[in-house]
Swiss-Prot record:
Compartment list: Cytoplasm; Nucleus; Cell projection, Cilium membrane; Cell projection, Rhabdomere
Keyword Phosphoprotein among record annotations: yes
Pfam family, one: Tub
Residue segments, region Disordered: 57-80, 98-191
GO terms, biological process: protein localization to cilium
Membrane topology qualifier: Peripheral membrane protein
GO CC list: ciliary membrane; cytoplasm; nucleus; rhabdomere
Keywords annotated in UniProt: Cell membrane, Cell projection, Cytoplasm, Membrane, Nucleus, Phosphoprotein
Sites of Phosphoserine modification: S136
Protein name: Protein king tubby
UniProt family annotation: Belongs to the TUB family.
Originating gene: king-tubby
Record's compositionally biased regions (Gly residues): 177-186
InterPro entries according to UniProt: Tubby-like_C, Tubby_C, Tubby_C_CS
Length: 443
């Protein structure tokens, strides 16, 4: 009996397909016409060859293999679908978070020198292709173009009759003493007094300020409108917050608000220091302080103008930029220039009129073409480590060895910014912000 029961349980026909009643309780008549197929759910497939819940016996190994193959195939398809979805999600995230470089520009890359000099670091930056200068439309870039430029109208940092410019006997990397750490005859700067006053004060001569800019792109709107934070680097990895900047959302042109209060980046904030405004094409930027253009007591002053050369022919190569600053007085203070004052001209108007008496003209340092690497090379002495078209060094034509400011990438959202006399933190930070902004018809 036990053997019979085990055999009965092992048979596949134990589960019936319907409520079939062979004999009616009240009648001895057989009536197969009273079969009730009342299942309209999954059980309707029990009698079907395509039954997904079919119980297979050990006597049909072919069926087991078929089911196993189908299960494996479905699992493989599901895994491929999940892999495709994950790849698409990663691609979308990468595109949204990836920095949009200027399409017309070649990125600046870092090379390793084969033979390192004891007085220089091995970190240099390079851009990939030579290109013609747009203003000359020549076939080959003249490396001495900036050096041989007519600079008769370019004013020195100090007015005429003063001592020679502080550009002599100093380089931004401190290579004069072979250390490359910025201690070549000058000291690293520190915050003196209140932050809001310090960021507007020109750097003293012989003092180098090493800073770091961090870009915050987290959040709903910060992918398109990131927030930038400027910190002064100190020893042992310490840093001091100086400025924060963000791009205004509702503005016809690019307009950045700069504040020394990281919690309130608005024009009405107590820490509002100034703003950066561009033209429609993004080729010209003007830096203003926190003054009121309608006020006569404290009018809004022009702090700087940044001009990027237009790329008419579409040649690729390093960016070309011109920075115009107010001149310096005998006591190392900026000349007050206000484009809001109808009685005087602004910095941009003075530069267009070639009136260089009270303004200073700077240019990005021309990279040197390297035949071995087939690229332009600039030496940042370890302060810049990654490729970007935003990497640059600002110099004066009268002394190309004195680097007024340098800026470059060290990681995806971290950049170094070093500046010295005659710039202040507000001017240098605004110049760096202009490099982040997208540009139409610019190289």
């Amino acid at each position: 009996m036990e053997a019979y029961i085990r055999q009965k349980r092992a048979s596949p026909g134990m589960v019936q397909a319907s409520d079939l009643q062979i004999n009616r309780p009240m009648s001895g008549m057989r009536s197969n016409s009273r079969e009730l197929h009342a299942y309209d759910g999954p059980m309707q497939f029990i009698s079907s060859p395509q039954n997904p819940d079919q119980i297979l016996t050990n006597g049909s190994p072919g069926g087991i293999n078929s089911v196993a193959m189908n299960t494996s195939r479905n699992h493989s398809n599901n895994m491929r679908s999940l892999s495709t979805i994950n790849q698409e999600a990663d691609l979308i995230e990468e595109i949204s978070s990836h920095e949009l470089e200027d399409e017309e520009s070649s990125p600046v890359t870092v090379i390793e020198q084969q033979q390192q000099s004891a007085s220089h670091s091995a970190n240099s930056t390079q851009s990939q292709k030579p290109r013609a200068r747009q203003h000359s439309f020549s076939d080959n870039l003249d490396e001495d173009d900036y050096t041989n430029r007519n600079v008769a109208g370019a004013a020195p940092v100090r007015p005429a009759g003063m001592a020679s410019s502080p550009y002599k006997d100093a380089t931004l990397d401190g290579s004069s003493n072979g250390t490359g750490n910025g201690t070549g005859g000058e000291s690293e700067g520190d915050v003196i007094g209140n932050i809001d006053q310090f960021v507007m004060q020109p750097a003293p001569q012989g003092v180098l300020y090493k800073c770091r800019i961090t870009r915050d792109r987290k959040g709903m709107d910060r992918g398109l409108f990131p927030i930038y934070y400027l910190h002064l680097e100190r020893d042992y990895g310490k840093k001091i917050f100086l400025l924060g900047g963000r791009k205004r959302k509702k503005s016809k042109t690019s307009n950045y608000i700069v504040s020394c209060d990281p919690t309130d980046l608005s024009r009405n904030a107590d820490g509002f220091c100034g703003k950066l405004r561009s033209n429609v094409f993004g080729t010209s930027f003007t830096v203003f302080d926190n003054g009121n253009k309608e006020s006569t007591e404290s009018p809004r002053l022009d702090l700087a103008v940044i001009i990027y050369d237009t790329n008419i022919l579409g040649f690729k190569g390093p960016r070309n930029m011109t920075v115009i600053l107010p001149g310096m007085t005998e006591d190392d203070q900026r000349v007050k220039i206000s484009s809001a004052d109808p009685k005087q001209q602004g910095i941009l108007d003075l530069w267009k009129m070639k009136n260089m008496d009270n303004i200073v003209e700077l240019h990005n340092k021309t990279p040197v073409w390297n035949d071995e690497t087939q690229s332009y090379v600039l030496n940042f002495h370890g302060r810049v480590t990654q490729a970007s078209v935003k990497n640059f060094q600002l110099v004066h034509d009268s002394d190309p060895e004195y680097i007024v400011m340098q800026f470059g990438r060290t990681s995806e959202d971290v950049f170094t910014m070093d500046y010295r006399y005659p710039l202040c933190a507000m001017q240098a930070f605004a110049i760096a912000l202009s490099s982040f902004d997208g540009k139409i018809a610019c190289e």
